[in-house]
């Protein structure tokens, strides 16, 4: 609530568009949900966006207040502010950012939060929350703009609420005992909607700030949940195959035999709801507790319960490999305009 109260005290109005230009940080979520409580509209901008792309979205969405992450985002945003009269205020998440000596209007997020730490700031937010409607605009999701000018898709709270309801019905196994790794950028509707659902279900969110560090982060966090795009799993597949191919003959034989067993068990029997032969089931259970368990421990995925994958086609070879080694992916399809998920495969079948 403190972020929402700070927004009200700062003068951010009902259904006012605000920008969030940052890599994944916890402050992004504070800002998003503070905006929702304040009935403002947070608009995510890719952390790698150029000043020209930022300028376009700021003008197109009539953004007056822009939250920025680290030094790169601040530098770009300040350049845009100098040529965009409508962009009046920058709020900086990272206190290590060095402001331009000519910057007289930007403030750090820590200072911004203090604005909400007074009794007067609480009242308007309570009124706004009481007046909130599912018809309120929740966010505008802009495309990356790599092939043309970015286009903004309008999503209302009703879109998110319906998404929560249907995912709750389809994924009852997601509970407050889970931990989800936030890896995809929160500017991507897949991650944004997935995080919203996880918070709705009481899931703990672990945020991976630097995409290049994900291989180090996963073994530290051991997530049970993580949504991702096929490219991530393609890299996992290639890496594992290289390790197997460069292993001594006996180890290579053990891994290849286990993968063959897993493929037969999962794809030919389990996924078709056919009871496997006892010998196959025993062999699979042994491989699952030894070979596959070791592989998943190395990857940091040994606690994995559900790994949704979407955003692009997933090749059959990668899909079959992941199912063979018992990594619980759930392949689906979605769009920004549909608040991500349109459909996804069941766990079995």
Roles of regions detected by a PLM:
Residues 32-38, 60, 196-200, 237, ...:
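Short hydrophobic alpha-helices that are characteristic scaffold elements of the AMP-binding
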Residues 3-52:
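Conserved AMP-binding/adenylate-forming
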Residues 117-142, 149, 173-179:
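Conserved pre-ATP/AMP-binding loop-to-beta segment of ANL
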Residues 138-164:
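Conserved AMP-binding A3 loop
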Residues 49-79, 163-181, 211-225, 298:
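Conserved ATP-dependent adenylate/AMP-binding module captured primarily in the ANL superfamily
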Residues 157, 314, 323-327, 335-349:
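Active-site loops of AMP-binding adenylate-forming
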Residues 161-179, 186-292, 303, 328:
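Conserved AMP-binding/adenylation subdomain of ANL enzymes
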Residues 72-134, 240-294:
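ANL superfamily adenylate-forming
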């Amino acid at each position: 609530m403190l972020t929402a109260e700070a927004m009200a005290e700062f003068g951010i109005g009902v259904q006012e568009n605000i920008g969030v230009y940052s890599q994944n940080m916890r402050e992004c979520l504070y800002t998003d949900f503070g905006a929702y409580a304040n009935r403002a509209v947070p608009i995510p901008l890719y952390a790698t966006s150029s000043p020209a792309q930022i300028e376009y979205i700021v003008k197109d969405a009539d953004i007056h207040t822009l939250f920025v992450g680290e030094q790169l985002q601040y530098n770009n945003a300040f350049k845009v502010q100098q040529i965009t009269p409508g962009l009046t205020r920058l709020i900086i998440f990272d206190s290590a950012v060095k402001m331009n000596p000519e910057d007289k209007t930007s403030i750090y997020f820590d200072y911004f939060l203090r604005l909400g730490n007074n009794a007067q700031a609480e009242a308007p937010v309570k009124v706004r929350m009481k007046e909130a409607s599912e018809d309120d605009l929740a966010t505008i999701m802009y495309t990356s703009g790599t092939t043309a000018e970015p286009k903004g898709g309008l999503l209302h709270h009703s879109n998110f609420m319906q998404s929560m309801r249907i995912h709750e019905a389809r994924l009852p196994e997601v509970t407050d005992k889970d931990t989800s790794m936030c890896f995809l950028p929160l500017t991507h509707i897949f991650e944004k909607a997935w995080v919203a659902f996880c918070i709705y279900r009481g899931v703990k969110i672990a945020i991976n700030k630097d995409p290049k560090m994900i291989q180090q982060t996963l073994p530290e966090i051991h997530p049970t949940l993580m949504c991702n795009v096929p490219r991530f799993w393609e890299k996992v597949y290639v890496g594992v195959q290289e390790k197997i191919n460069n292993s001594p003959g006996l180890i290579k034989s053990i891994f290849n035999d286990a993968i063959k067993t897993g493929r037969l068990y999962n794809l030919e029997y389990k996924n078709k709801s056919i009871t496997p032969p006892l010998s196959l089931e025993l062999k699979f259970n042994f491989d699952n507790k030894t070979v596959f368990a070791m592989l998943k421990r190395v990857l940091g995925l040994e606690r994995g319960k559900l790994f949704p994958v979407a955003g692009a086609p997933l090749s059959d070879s990668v899909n079959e490999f992941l199912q063979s080694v018992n990594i619980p992916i759930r392949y689906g399809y979605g769009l920004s305009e549909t608040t991500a998920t349109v459909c996804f495969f069941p766990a079995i079948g």
